[in-house]
């Protein structure tokens, strides 16, 4: 059989189709139903295969090729059809016409989903190659490669003498490299060399492309005889991907290019390489070189440079380049606008991103999933979750389906971070209903959000669901569960989960241990933290600085500062360096007990180790500085000394390039107020404003409370009035503090005035606020004023409680009045 196929293919004598081959188009009037009544030779399951395929051939001769294959009789035979039968039939058909054999192959495959043997597939492949039907050849061989592999031995042994075998080998090489079948492509290349078969430049380029990021690229390159533009461009791209940009430029100038000349594609690779490394100016110079060489930069060329400019923050230059694209005969595409929108997003300029998208729509371009993802990221980053949901709804209304996990994950993250877990779960379920399977990232986001809110039952249910779907949870997923349990104080449950992960044999990183150790430390369970630390060491896992920082915090929380100090030395024994958190945590413990000497020692040690302090570090230093002085023994000289040290501390911060923030100033102001240096506190308030830092309500609360505590009520009134003139929003605490101070000082008129302001500004006034005022007025025997506030409370729909009634009853002058109103308690 094989010999006859080889003889047919090797013969150069053209054959005319025999009458048998015309059966494909003849006897069209023959009734298929009538065929069932004809006497056809039949076979049973015990018949030999030769009789079986003869029955099929007889049927095709009797009624016509097409009619028989589509008839009911053949449909009944298909289930018994085997590879050997098909090969015998194709043998007969090949002797008449190769077209018939190919057609029979396709009919069985397409109509009856018959899975052909590798031999039949290679046979048809050789026929198609001989007829230069390369697209069909590619489809057939690609499927064969994916299902069976290269089958080099079968190809070598059975089809060596076919004239078209070189084309089949070449196509196999091309497809195997394109399908990233590395070992197969190299083996095919070796077999082709052994048989002296010609390898096309296209196939060589495909192999070269696959190895472009390795040194193997040069071995393939040297074997290519007829190099073309694609060959050179692939080498340049490979060198750029290997970050060998100087070699790429040198190769670009090589003499091998003299006949072809460099292409825009090669310049694009070099520009992209420089942009990825942040050397945008170099990329711009090559863009100019493209123009000097008489080449026309493509849209992709512009997009590379625009993206590079956006990544380094040169958004204005990127916009200018985009507007000049039409000068080079190209127009910005949706990718261009997406890059610009992302550039604005990276700078936090979401309004600019919206302007770019509006321009995009004006140009008649439609936003894609990437566009929406960029806008969603921007809105969620700014906390505009509702706007993000509007964008998602608009995306769906434009016909986009939830077929991309990225925008959904962005939205899920935004919802979970703002505590809107019910909406996150709704979106999560909608994704599944629309056929979009959540991935590991999506599951981890929702599980983390549920754990933050303490909804562990739902979190564990989702955890089990993802495991059932064979989505393996990673450290982030486990970390979310452990962190949530620790934050809720469920340390036993957290330890149980960690132990189950350890016993499962799964490789755990130090992060998971750190979460539980930190949970123990923050709860003051230092012994349990140390016990788990021993487990870490015994397991052979290297602890991190975060591990030791948690232990330092735990010791400090339990007032064992001496042991916490020793941890700094232990860190170094493990080849690690203490971090700024290590020192700041220990400094805070010393600050709480006013040990400024130890704080100074740690500060000097930080400088010696080259560890720069942070705003938090300096806030702790200021706290220690102020607490180091006994408040009751603080005379004017000591206050001035503290004041000057605070000013020097600010100068030190600025000299180290650390701009003081609100917390720093609030810390200084608070402790200056505690030592009764109010003038100094107001000086720092002015310094704060001069640094363009807006004082928070906490800052004003500290100052107003201090003025009232130390009896400077009029100054407090003036201060609040000046703040109101500046349209500064004050907190409820500021008003109630001053109201209570006026009541104590016996100035009910000002208290009434401020209370009206409190109500006018829409604050939620409770019975506790009325009780505080009435209580103080009654103690001062201010009957009418107490009565006024009592009536005001009733007018606001607030009923008095037992405490208020008792206070008013104790005032003799109010007793009869309370009885009159029927408010005497039982």
Swiss-Prot record:
UniProt keywords, alphabetically: Repeat
Signal peptide limits: none
PROSITE patterns reported for this sequence: PPR
InterPro entries for the chain: Pentatricopeptide_rpt (IPR002885), PPR-containing_protein (IPR050667), TPR-like_helical_dom_sf (IPR011990)
Keyword presence, ATP-binding: no
PPR repeats: 228-262, 263-297, 298-332, 333-367, 368-402, 404-438, 439-473, 474-508, 509-543, 544-578, 579-613, 614-648, 661-695, 696-730, 731-765, 766-800
Stated family: Belongs to the PPR family. P subfamily.
Name of this chain's protein: Putative pentatricopeptide repeat-containing protein At1g13630
Organism, scientific name: Arabidopsis thaliana
């Amino acid at each position: 059989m094989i010999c006859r196929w080889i003889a047919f293919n090797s013969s150069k004598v053209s054959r005319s189709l025999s009458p048998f081959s015309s059966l494909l188009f003849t006897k069209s009037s023959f009734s298929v139903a009538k065929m069932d009544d004809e006497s056809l030779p039949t076979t049973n399951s015990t018949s030999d295969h030769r009789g079986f395929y003869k029955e099929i051939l007889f049927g095709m001769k009797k009624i016509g090729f097409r009619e028989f294959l589509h008839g009911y009789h053949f449909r009944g035979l298909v289930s018994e059809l085997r590879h050997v039968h098909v090969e015998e039939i194709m043998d007969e058909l090949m002797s008449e016409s190769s077209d018939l054999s190919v057609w029979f192959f396709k009919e069985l495959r397409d109509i009856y989903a018959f899975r052909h043997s590798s031999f039949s597939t290679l046979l048809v492949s050789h026929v198609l190659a001989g007829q230069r039907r390369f697209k069909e050849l590619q489809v057939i061989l690609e499927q064969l490669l994916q299902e069976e592999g290269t089958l080099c031995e079968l190809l070598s042994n059975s089809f060596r003498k076919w004239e078209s075998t070189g084309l089949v080998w070449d196509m196999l090489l091309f497809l195997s490299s394109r399908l990233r079948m590395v070992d197969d492509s190299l083996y095919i290349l070796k077999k082709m060399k052994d048989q002296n078969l010609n390898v096309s430049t296209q196939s060589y380029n495909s192999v070269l492309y696959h190895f472009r990021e390795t040194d193997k690229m040069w071995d393939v390159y040297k074997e290519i005889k007829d190099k073309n533009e694609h060959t050179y461009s692939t080498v340049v791209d490979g060198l750029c991907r290997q970050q060998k940009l100087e070699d790429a430029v040198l190769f670009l100038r090589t003499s091998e290019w003299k006949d072809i000349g460099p292409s825009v594609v090669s310049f694009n690779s070099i520009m992209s390489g420089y942009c990825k490394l942040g050397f945008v100016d170099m990329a711009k110079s090559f863009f100019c070189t493209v123009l000097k060489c008489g080449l026309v930069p493509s849209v992709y060329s512009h997009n590379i440079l625009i993206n590079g400019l956006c990544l380094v923050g040169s958004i204005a230059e990127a916009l200018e380049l985009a507007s000049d694209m039409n000068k080079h005969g190209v127009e910005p595409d949706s990718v261009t606008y997406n890059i610009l929108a992302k550039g604005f997003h990276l700078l936090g300029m979401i309004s600019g991103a919206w302007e770019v998208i509006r321009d995009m729509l004006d140009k008649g371009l439609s936003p894609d999933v990437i566009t929406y993802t960029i806008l969603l990221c921007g809105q969620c980053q700014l906390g505009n979750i509702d706007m993000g949901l509007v964008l998602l709804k608009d995306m769906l209304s434009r016909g986009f389906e939830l077929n991309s996990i990225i925008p959904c994950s962005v939205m899920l993250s935004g919802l979970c971070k703002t505590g809107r877990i019910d909406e996150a779960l709704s979106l999560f379920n909608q994704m599944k209903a629309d056929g979009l399977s959540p991935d590991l990232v999506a599951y981890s986001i929702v599980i983390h959000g549920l754990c933050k809110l303490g909804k562990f039952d739902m979190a564990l249910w989702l955890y089990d669901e993802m495991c059932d779907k064979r989505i393996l949870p990673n450290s982030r997923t486990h970390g979310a569960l452990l962190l949530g349990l620790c934050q809720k104080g469920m340390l036993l449950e957290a330890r149980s989960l960690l132990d189950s992960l350890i016993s499962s044999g799964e490789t755990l990183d130090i992060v998971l241990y750190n979460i539980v150790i930190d949970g123990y430390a923050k709860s003051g369970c230092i012994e349990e933290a140390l016990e788990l630390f021993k487990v870490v060491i015994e397991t052979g896992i290297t602890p991190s600085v975060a591990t030791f920082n948690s232990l330092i915090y735990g010791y400090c929380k339990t007032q064992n500062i001496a042991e916490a100090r020793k941890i700094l030395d232990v860190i170094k024994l493990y080849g690690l360096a203490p971090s700024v958190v290590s020192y700041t945590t220990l400094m805070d413990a010393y600050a709480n007990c006013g040990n400024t000497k130890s704080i100074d020692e740690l500060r000097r040690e930080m400088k010696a180790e080259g560890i720069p302090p942070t705003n938090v570090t300096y806030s702790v230093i200021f706290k220690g500085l102020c607490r180091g002085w006994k408040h009751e023994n603080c005379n004017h000289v000591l206050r001035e000394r503290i004041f000057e040290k605070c000013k020097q501390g600010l100068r030190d911060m600025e000299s180290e390039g650390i701009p003081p923030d609100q917390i720093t100033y609030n810390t200084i102001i608070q402790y200056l107020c505690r030592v009764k240096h109010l003038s100094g506190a107001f000086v720092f308030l002015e310094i704060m404003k001069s640094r363009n830092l807006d004082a928070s309500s906490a800052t004003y609360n500290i100052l107003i409370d201090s003025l009232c505590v130390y009896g400077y009520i009029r100054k407090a009134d003036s201060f609040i009035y000046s703040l109101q003139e500046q349209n500064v929003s004050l907190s409820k605490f500021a008003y109630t503090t001053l109201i209570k101070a006026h009541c104590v000082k016996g100035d009910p008129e000002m208290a009434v005035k401020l209370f009206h302001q409190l109500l006018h500004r829409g604050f939620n006034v409770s019975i506790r606020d009325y009780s505080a005022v009435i209580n103080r007025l009654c103690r001062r025997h201010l009957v009418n004023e107490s009565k006024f506030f009592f009536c005001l409370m009733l007018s606001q729909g607030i009923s008095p409680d037992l405490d208020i009634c008792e206070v008013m009853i104790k005032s003799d002058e109010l007793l009869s009045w309370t009885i009159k109103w029927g408010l005497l308690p039982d």
